[in-house]
Amino acid sequence: MSAQDFLVELGTEELPPKALNTLADAFLAGIEKGLHSAGLKFEAKKVYAAPRRLAVLLTALETQQPDRSINLDGPPRQAAFDAEGNPTQAALGFAKKCGVELSEIDQSGPKLRFSQVITGKPTASLLPTIVEDSLNDLPIPKRMRWGARKEEFVRPTQWLVMLLGDQVIDCTLLAQKAGRDSRGHRFHHPQAVRITSPANYAADLRAAYVLADANERRELISKRTEELARLQEGTAIVPPSLLDEVTALVEWPVPLVCSFEERFLDVPQEALITTMQDNQKYFCLLDVDGKLLPRFITVANIESKDPQQIIAGNEKVVRPRLTDAEFFFKQDKKQKLEDFNLRLQNVVFQEKLGSVYDKAVRVSKLAAYIAQRIGGDAAWAARAGLLSKCDLATEMVGEFPEMQGVAGYYYALNDGEPDDVALALNEQYMPRGAGAELPTTLTGAAVAIADKLDTLVGIFGIGMLPTGSKDPYALRRAALGVLRILIDKKLDLDLTQAVVFAVGQFGAKVKQAGLAEQVLEFVFDRLRARYEDEGVDVSVYLSVRALQPGSALDFDQRVQAVQAFRKLPEADALASVNKRVSNLLSKAEGLGNADVDPGLFADAKEFSLNSAIAKAENAVKPLIAERNYAEALARLATLREPVDAFFEAVMINAEDAGVRKNRYAMLARLRGLFVNIADISTLS
């Protein structure tokens, strides 16, 4: 079957940069979907996206749709005709469904059957509808109209190229008649660009100062920015999201180095970086020590004969932004950080839970409680907790919300607070996302945990539980944050006690009954997803969850031990035995509560198992005390042989009540060895 390259390019006014890649991928996916439905194949695909265009190139697209056979079975003959041979409603309905007369239906078989061969259409006749459907299905939250037209799109359209080989597809989409003329760079090549063939699309546009391939532009910007930063003896900060956005803003990227006055370096560099990245889309430069350099890189969309003019323009634009940050910083420092708490007394945290200041007081007390139990300084934690929300009332955070915590850190240092207290004001928000940085100090960890637990307890206490995708107070993230800090920083905190302490601080503001249990269940339930992501089988998680350890660190240590135990050759057999023993004990009320009496043993295997259990108890007890659960389980794995021999030789439910009770007591003792670590019966 013959094939031709296919190109479609929709030209527009400047597209939303943050949505450009999504729109391009969806455009390609929609066209692929339409071609698949039509039974049309192609060899390769390529999507192009630039500020003023979306394009798709398909290599070797079939030019003719293949013929299709339709075979539909209808009702059985006996149901299709009555005794006189007249068609029933079932037969007539089937014919109507097929869109033909009953006489065109095959009646020779046991069922009515409709067969038809549909001749394929030329691909050129199908493409307009396929492209139109793809454009209509693009994920555009809000479409716009322009001029007096009825058509709607994310931005006004300007031109349309649609070629199948050398043939222009005759159609009009979104008010644009298809042709072979594209447009070049708005300034370097404003006139039309004739696309010589689909395969030459990128080359034709390159000659007109347009790099249509977003990946090519991205790579060019990244590489050139890195080179320029190196020439400035620095390293560029290039967040992937910012790189994507800048890539979507330019058709012909030209990175340039600009500078600003060194006096602005007295302002917290995070504020300067925030305003330059978010507002101006600049790449900031850091020196070898991670300090901000008074230079930045802008990406121009033009190859200027006088680049210094562009540089001067950008330096002029950024100066007021940096001046604002400098002003806010100086204004805020005119009063002590603690004084901002007065403003927070009038700022509502949650209507039923009081002000932001009330929250800070609770966090202060809870942080001190936690610090005492993880080896931190309670006084520092209390102080950091009390100051934790002060910067929310500052001018700096009011202008740059991303500076919360960071601003507090600088203002606390300015006031002479201890370094750990200052650091904790920023670290309270850690981790800020999955895999993000954790607190580096015990004070920061204590405040971070306290802040999150206070939010969890408070919001749960007024019944505002997260449902489905709705989690306005980010409670899931808070719970995961608490767990990550405790486990990854190896902090042994009894969460049960900490949550009970947190509940007590709210008094009558929350429903106390069962609240601590509800919060703890929610927090520890988050571990299931964490372990699944790490490749830990859910049965391992459940084996530890059954014991309900109060410490997240202890929980994790048990999980890691059980995960290692699962790999031992004895694991499956012992898990099955534990399950069997668990079932037996659950049905034998009270039989497992007695002490084991060797005088009632009737079989040598009972003596052997009892001796093995005693040895295991002596070996395992100190290991469990040290939380060396992996070694303890490895030691318990040696019980497999005497356990197997016992079950083969001994009937548990002996006729003699005393013997029976004694055997159940020994099984309870055996199970207790494992349950001190995890309920491994869940592994079976």
UniProtKB/Swiss-Prot annotation:
EC number in record: 6.1.1.14
Keywords, in A-Z order: Aminoacyl-tRNA synthetase, ATP-binding, Cytoplasm, Ligase, Nucleotide-binding, Protein biosynthesis
One GO cellular component, as annotated: cytosol
Catalytic reaction(s) noted: tRNA(Gly) + glycine + ATP = glycyl-tRNA(Gly) + AMP + diphosphate
InterPro entries: DALR_anticod-bd, Gly-tRNA-synth_bsu, Gly-tRNA-synth_heterodimer
Domain of life, per lineage: Bacteria
PROSITE patterns on file: AA_TRNA_LIGASE_II_GLYAB (PS50861)
GO MF term (any one): arginine-tRNA ligase activity
GO BP annotation list: arginyl-tRNA aminoacylation; glycyl-tRNA aminoacylation
Compartment(s): Cytoplasm
Pfam (any one): DALR_1
HAMAP family (UniProt xref): Gly_tRNA_synth_beta
NCBIfam families recorded: glyS
Oligomer status and interactors: Tetramer of two alpha and two beta subunits.
Record family assignment: Belongs to the class-II aminoacyl-tRNA synthetase family.
Name by which UniProt lists this protein: Glycine--tRNA ligase beta subunit
Biological source species: Pseudomonas fluorescens (strain SBW25)
